[in-house]
């Protein structure tokens, strides 16, 4: 796996070099240096799970056959396209959320001399994806499907982000809107499609499959993405900041988090009043009251039960799939996220 990771990182260097010498634009030394630094700061710094899972998925769909160098390169290039998409979302997301840290370092727009140039950097990151696809996939029979896939998933993610942002609008904060179905909608569109479905869809296209024949796989992956986001919501409050690489602010930010939805479900009127009075306020005293209520309601125990039930349900869905290769792929995904701490 360490070897796969280093191979994957080598492909990043190749793609970055191609983008820094893209013939469609005449770079000056300053602009090339800016882009070089911007890419290194934002693209390769995460866990790389989404990108690496394209290679894993492709290998499993080929029944575990060893991939040749060309196949590894192409699967890696698609994996990096997803990492580029992720970088684009995060750079802009951090501006919108006025965040401070990301992956254990200051958000890009917080770096001296960057500021709002980060907005254009986000647009550039998004535009690098079709450049990479054109250079390496233009002759492939699935090229148009790849372009369609990335466009559709980006649309779904941006639309999920919209629901997330408008539910947290200043002056329109209304906890009574926060339900499990709203939470699921935000998660499905904002996270599940690009984090879970997209890597597998890329691998399916590479092995010549038609995505319309794999709606069941998409549904299982969206369920997995929902489970992943519930873990994220849980870790935002109960995870160790040094482990997760960021300081959680869901309570201050009035996020439609799984925790607040469950708290609303389980609270009596008095406890609901504590939530209504304190949720979405930046003062640490208000945040502490919400966290104390979460403890009072034993949300850690409620989460543990949710985690085991979700796991069982996902395993049952996966084992109902007719293809052993697809089962292996989905189980490997689930194995990576079950009981994760970061």
Swiss-Prot record:
Annotated dimethylallyl diphosphate binding sites: 102, 190-191, 229, 246, 255
Any one cellular-component term (Gene Ontology): cytoplasm
Cysteines joined through disulfide linkages: none
GO terms of biological process kind: cholesterol biosynthetic process; farnesyl diphosphate biosynthetic process; geranyl diphosphate biosynthetic process
InterPro entries, per database record: FPS1-like, Isoprenoid_synthase_dom_sf, Polyprenyl_synt, Polyprenyl_synt_CS
Reactions listed under catalytic activity: isopentenyl diphosphate + dimethylallyl diphosphate = (2E)-geranyl diphosphate + diphosphate; isopentenyl diphosphate + (2E)-geranyl diphosphate = (2E,6E)-farnesyl diphosphate + diphosphate
EC number assigned by the record: 2.5.1.10, 2.5.1.1
Pathway assigned to this chain's UniProt record: Isoprenoid biosynthesis; farnesyl diphosphate biosynthesis; farnesyl diphosphate from geranyl diphosphate and isopentenyl diphosphate: step 1/1; Isoprenoid biosynthesis; geranyl diphosphate biosynthesis; geranyl diphosphate from dimethylallyl diphosphate and isopentenyl diphosphate: step 1/1
Keywords recorded for this protein, A-Z: Cholesterol biosynthesis, Cholesterol metabolism, Cytoplasm, Isoprene biosynthesis, Lipid biosynthesis, Lipid metabolism, Magnesium, Metal-binding, Steroid biosynthesis, Steroid metabolism, Sterol biosynthesis, Sterol metabolism, Transferase
Cofactor needs: Mg(2+)
Highest taxon, organism lineage: Eukaryota
Record family assignment: Belongs to the FPP/GGPP synthase family.
Function: Catalyzes the sequential condensation of isopentenyl pyrophosphate with the allylic pyrophosphates, dimethylallyl pyrophosphate, and then with the resultant geranylpyrophosphate to the ultimate product farnesyl pyrophosphate.
Protein name (record): Farnesyl pyrophosphate synthase 1
Record organism: Lupinus albus (White lupine)
């Amino acid at each position: 796996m360490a070897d796969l990771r280093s191979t994957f990182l080598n492909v990043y260097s190749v793609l970055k070099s191609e983008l820094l010498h893209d013939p469609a634009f005449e770079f000056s030394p300053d602009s090339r240096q800016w882009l070089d630094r911007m890419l290194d700061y934002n693209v390769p710094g995460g866990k790389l799970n989404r990108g690496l899972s394209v290679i894993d998925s492709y290998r499993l769909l080929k029944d575990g056959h060893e991939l040749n160098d060309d196949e590894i390169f192409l699967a890696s290039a698609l994996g990096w396209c997803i990492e580029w998409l992720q970088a684009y979302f995060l750079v802009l997301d951090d501006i919108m959320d006025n965040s401070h840290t990301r992956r254990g370092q200051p958000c890009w727009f917080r770096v001296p001399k960057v500021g709002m140039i980060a907005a254009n950097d986000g647009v550039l990151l998004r535009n690098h994806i079709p450049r990479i696809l054109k250079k390496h996939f233009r002759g492939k029979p699935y090229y148009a499907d790849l372009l369609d896939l990335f466009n559709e998933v980006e649309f779904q993610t941006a639309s999920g982000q919209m629901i997330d942002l408008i539910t947290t609008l200043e002056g329109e904060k209304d906890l009574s809107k926060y339900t499990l179905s709203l939470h699921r909608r935000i998660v499905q569109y904002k996270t599940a499609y690009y984090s879970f479905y997209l890597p597998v869809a890329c691998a399916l296209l590479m092995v010549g499959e038609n995505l319309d024949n794999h709606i069941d796989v998409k549904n299982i992956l969206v369920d997995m993405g929902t489970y992943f986001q519930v873990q994220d919501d849980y870790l935002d409050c109960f995870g160790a900041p040094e482990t997760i690489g960021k300081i959680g602010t869901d309570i201050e930010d009035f996020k439609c988090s799984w925790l607040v939805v469950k708290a609303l479900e389980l609270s009596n009127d008095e406890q609901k009043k504590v939530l209504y009075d304190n949720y979405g306020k930046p003062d640490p005293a208000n945040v502490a009251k919400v966290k104390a209520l979460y403890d009072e309601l034993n949300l850690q125990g409620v989460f543990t039960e949710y985690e085991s039930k979700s796991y069982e349900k996902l395993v049952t869905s996966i084992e109902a799939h007719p293809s052993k290769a697809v089962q292996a792929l989905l189980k490997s995904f689930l194995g990576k996220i079950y009981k994760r701490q970061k």
